[in-house]
Amino acid sequence: NNSGDINCKNITCETITITEALGDVELDNITAVTIDVINNSGDINCTNITSNELSIEDDLGNIYLDKVICEENISITNSSGDIDINNIESTDVSIEDDLGNITMIGIDISNGTITNSSGDITIEDGSVETLNVKGDLGDIELYLKGELSDYDYTLETDLGDVEVNEKDEGSKGEVINNSKNLIEVSNDCGDIKLDIK
């Protein structure tokens, strides 16, 4: 579609592929094995999605996900705009944003990779096994479920403070518990906060 909004609702199929040049894309109550969405300029909203693989690319616009279950992986790339994710379950999640905030609330994932060039990264009410977070400019705050002893973690910032469960760790915090769960966070400029309770 070259210009205009795209709305897809109440669809069950094998594959959904959407390419939009200018306009918003909305998916609601979709069940498909593979879902691919590419948008050059406009918001992307996905709610009530069940899939094996979900891929979203946006050059300019906000991305919003709510109530998404993916058996295998979720991949999200945004050049400019916020990424807001609520209530997702997936094995692998990869998120990359060049300019904008990344906010994730109520996530249950096995492996997560999150990269942001400019903007904050926030995870609340998160359940993860392996998490790798990289920020260039912005604060990183992770509020995860469980016990601190359940995780090995390495948190390091070049310019900013590191805080683990409300304890100041300076510019680097590291603990090796020989746990199966691993958190690695690096930041060039900005604070890092890890809270596991």
Predicted regions, residues:
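Low-complexity/repetitive intrinsically disordered segments
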Residues: 1-8, 16
